[in-house]
Amino acid sequence: MSEAMMWLLVRGVWETLAMTFVSGFFGFVIGLPVGVLLYVTRPGQIMENARLYRSLSAVVNIFRSIPFIILLVWMIPFTRIIVGTSIGLQAAIVPLTVGAAPFIARMVENALLEIPAGLIEASRAMGATPLQIVRKILLPEALPGLVNAATITLITLVGYSAMGGAVGAGGLGQIGYQYGYIGYNATVMNTVLVLLVVLVYLIQLSGDRIVRAVTHK
């Protein structure tokens, strides 16, 4: 493997990490409040609102059901409006964020559902407001589950970013497709696969350690 290809792979790793973590961050900025809203508006919860819950849940389910490669192509016009181009690192972050947000929202809701109902009832009995319950009870108690959700999301985004590489998003996916598949270079393809596996392993390892650190003893 040439030195130029090695540097290209290094840049591909950096671009993949950038796409993964930046879109993961923005996905959580959108998905976390949506997930909390899904939870608190569920039947029997602190801000029960059946109409809002059904509407929000339907939107989340619709976007979750769209395969990422189709979402990527469908969002090309919107991506051009937002970042001015439909290819490259910045362009990839837009559909990655949109793909991640509903996934995160549902996992946040599920993490909150694991909290014992007695804690919430005790807080309500002491006169806590819904906002106080969310800030001081729900989010702290669900922190291990939220960290686990973040880990799963980042791993999913690594795979999404690789798919995006096939349509010019950059990163390891584009290198594997352009130089490995199109260029019939098995060495490059295998190297890309190994690098993706290593990235996923490191993200999972880091996530597991953080979960252990924040889990109540």
UniProtKB/Swiss-Prot annotation:
Main location: membrane
GO cellular component, one term: plasma membrane
Keyword terms, alphabetized: Amino-acid transport, Cell inner membrane, Cell membrane, Membrane, Transmembrane, Transmembrane helix, Transport
InterPro entries, per database record: AA_ABC_Transporter_Permease (IPR051322), MetI-like (IPR000515), MetI-like_sf (IPR035906)
Membrane topology, as annotated: Multi-pass membrane protein
Residue span(s) of domain ABC transmembrane type-1: 13-204
CDD domains: TM_PBP2
Keyword field contains Cell membrane: yes
Periplasmic side: 1-19, 78-92, 173-185
Transmembrane segment boundaries: 20-40, 55-77, 93-113, 152-172, 186-206
Superkingdom of origin: Bacteria
Biological processes per GO annotation: D-methionine transmembrane transport
Ranges in the topological domain labelled Cytoplasmic: 41-54, 114-151, 207-217
Subcellular location: Cell inner membrane
Gene3D superfamilies: MetI-like
Primary role: Part of the binding-protein-dependent transport system for D-methionine and the toxic methionine analog alpha-methyl-methionine. Probably responsible for the translocation of the substrate across the membrane.
Family as reported in the entry's similarity comment: Belongs to the binding-protein-dependent transport system permease family. CysTW subfamily.
PANTHER family reported for this sequence: ABC TRANSPORTER PERMEASE, D-METHIONINE TRANSPORT SYSTEM PERMEASE PROTEIN METI
Protein name in the entry: D-methionine transport system permease protein MetI
Organism classification: Bacteria, Pseudomonadati, Pseudomonadota, Gammaproteobacteria, Enterobacterales
Gene: metI
